[in-house]
Amino acid sequence: MFLLYEYDIFWAFLIISSVIPILAFFISGVLAPISKGPEKLSSYESGIEPMGDAWLQFRIRYYMFALVFVVFDVETVFLYPWAMSFDVLGVSVFIEALIFVLILIVGSVYAWRKGALEWS
């Protein structure tokens, strides 16, 4: 059976780090003046009236690069703790990490074949 008292600091940190932003939003909503006029509802760019349309289209390539970056960033987040405790975990966890890396390699080859990594 797990002894959960070892995680008291984690739970306290989680609760405090969740309560502080909620309180900040609540207090700012209560204390902020409510004034909705035409100036409040108009858009601006750096304090001046906007020139042109407010909606700009961006290329889908930015989205694809961001998606591939997130995949490899998450891979790093998962593999770093494994690498730090490699000598303690054993062979079974090594095999699981290899399977994880192989799945990510298959995904990156798929993205490469589909042209997600090309900037043309």
UniProtKB/Swiss-Prot annotation:
Higher taxonomy: Eukaryota, Viridiplantae, Streptophyta, Embryophyta, Tracheophyta
InterPro entries: NAD(P)H_OxRDtase_bac/plastid (IPR023043), NADH_UbQ/plastoQ_OxRdtase_su3 (IPR000440), NDAH_ubi_oxred_su3_sf (IPR038430)
TM stretches of this protein: 9-29, 64-84, 88-108
One GO CC annotation: NADH dehydrogenase complex
Subcellular location: Plastid, Chloroplast thylakoid membrane
Principal subcellular localization: plastid
Keyword match Membrane: yes
Pfam families: Oxidored_q4 (PF00507)
Stored HAMAP family: NDH1_NuoA
Complexes and interactors: NDH is composed of at least 16 different subunits, 5 of which are encoded in the nucleus.
Keyword hit for NADP: yes
Gene Ontology biological-process entries: photosynthesis, light reaction
Catalysis performed (reactions): a plastoquinone + NADH + (n+1) H(+)(in) = a plastoquinol + NAD(+) + n H(+)(out); a plastoquinone + NADPH + (n+1) H(+)(in) = a plastoquinol + NADP(+) + n H(+)(out)
EC numbers for this chain: 7.1.1.-
Protein name (database record): NAD(P)H-quinone oxidoreductase subunit 3, chloroplastic
Family: Belongs to the complex I subunit 3 family.
Function field: NDH shuttles electrons from NAD(P)H:plastoquinone, via FMN and iron-sulfur (Fe-S) centers, to quinones in the photosynthetic chain and possibly in a chloroplast respiratory chain. The immediate electron acceptor for the enzyme in this species is believed to be plastoquinone. Couples the redox reaction to proton translocation, and thus conserves the redox energy in a proton gradient.
Entry keyword set: Chloroplast, Membrane, NAD, NADP, Plastid, Plastoquinone, Quinone, Thylakoid, Translocase, Transmembrane, Transmembrane helix, Transport
